[in-house]
Amino acid sequence: SVGFKAGVKEYKLTYYTPEYQTKDTDILAAFRVTPQPGVPPEEAGAAVAAESSTGTWTTVWTDGLTSLDRYKGRCYRIERVVGEKDQYIAYVAYPLDLFEEGSVTNMFTSIVGNVFGFKALRALRLEDLRIPPAYVKTFQGPPHGIQVERDKLNKYGRPLLGCTIKPKLGLSAKNYGRAVYECLRGGLDFTKDDENVNSQPFMRWRDRFLFCAEALFKAQVETGEIKGHYLNATAGTCEEMIKRAVFARELGVPIVMHDYLTGGFTANTSLAHYCRDNGLLLHIHRAMHAVIDRQKNHGIHFRVLAKALRMSGGDHIHSGTVVGKLEGERDITLGFVDLLRDDFVEQDRSRGIYFTQDWVSLPGVLPVASGGIHVWHMPALTEIFGDDSVLQFGGGTLGHPWGNAPGAVANRVALEACVKARNEGRDLAREGNEIIREASKWSPELAAACEVWKEIVFNFAAVDVLDK
């Protein structure tokens, strides 16, 4: 006899354990599971737990060489999704020993690796993760965090203002630098490389870095304010990425940028460590996120990608606007904005938060609202996101009829007016338009911007909404 019973047995016999009491050190996951017809939810939930931890499709004799009870993932609860006839939320607990310390890459390889192609499931979505303090403590997290960034920039009591330079591709380095100067001179705190600006034939990275550094130092001297431009260090190799970050540091600029999903978590974490060691802020763009998070029944919810970024490291991340051209429902967006900024967030299913999360003082990340926003949105953005945010107007700055600098002036005046009104106790949600109109009486730049964008709306319902 070989000493073990060969063959295939149902996952639920080993991996479905409704009596399990979760531990403080477990990583907890909430999966939205859509089983194939005829597959019971317990078997589907157990299959997810098995395939994302120790299981394989058949019994193997090497199972006897380890303690499966110590290492296996466990599906400990299953809930039916309200309003859906074949969807369930399966809760899975993973022992901490399954994961390498300080590695988002390894965590995701286990939890969202092969299991998403599993035949017994029609669809699978990771809705949320609870990262235990014991695991959080193995990560550096954001290079600096919100308070250190404010201290570096000497900017307090208001959201920060940014602008993505457009057209995103095709400008020469000198013309690009000119646009950066005009926007910063007009009153913005930051300008930004677009996510797909790396080092193309029309504008090599080194030329762009030099002209942008010249632009921001000139604007800094003339305004007396600290300025920044997000220099995109994303590259084809990690070595090249770090080389670009080193050059940015040598120029003396305050901030660089990375596309964390296309660049990858390993590269991102390396860059975040470099940025902390060398005093650079790190702006994160989420290019490719909607491929992963847009579908309601399959993929990974952005709140999980946001948590992963806070662990991997970044001082800013794009988070949707609620009011602009890109996807984002208000309660869901504010749920993951709190997960980015706050030290402790309570479970709140009305905002899509499945687990209480304690970040044990890991630095916070500034959410960046960007995409199809303009001066009329300023009161809503100020009210929704509060002071600890970056409001980024690309077309809403560069599309101003009088040019880039007046576009920047219009946005700065609108922001200052909204912050002043809020501090005086006015209701931005109700009086927003009136506040902007009042401010435009003494700012011709704002008046012109108000006229151009008064009719622009993006009336599409969000795809990713809460279960009712």
Curated annotation (Swiss-Prot):
Modification after translation: The disulfide bond which can form in the large chain dimeric partners within the hexadecamer appears to be associated with oxidative stress and protein turnover.
Pfam families (UniProt xref): RuBisCO_large, RuBisCO_large_N
Keyword RNA-binding part of the UniProt annotation: no
Compartments, record wording: Plastid, Chloroplast
Enzyme Commission no: 4.1.1.39
Note: The basic functional RuBisCO is composed of a large chain homodimer in a 'head-to-tail' conformation. In form I RuBisCO this homodimer is arranged in a barrel-like tetramer with the small subunits forming a tetrameric 'cap' on each end of the 'barrel'.
Role according to the record: RuBisCO catalyzes two reactions: the carboxylation of D-ribulose 1,5-bisphosphate, the primary event in carbon dioxide fixation, as well as the oxidative fragmentation of the pentose substrate in the photorespiration process. Both reactions occur simultaneously and in competition at the same active site.
Subunit note: Heterohexadecamer of 8 large chains and 8 small chains; disulfide-linked. The disulfide link is formed within the large subunit homodimers.
Name of this chain's protein: Ribulose bisphosphate carboxylase large chain
Source organism per UniProt: Datura stramonium
Originating gene: rbcL
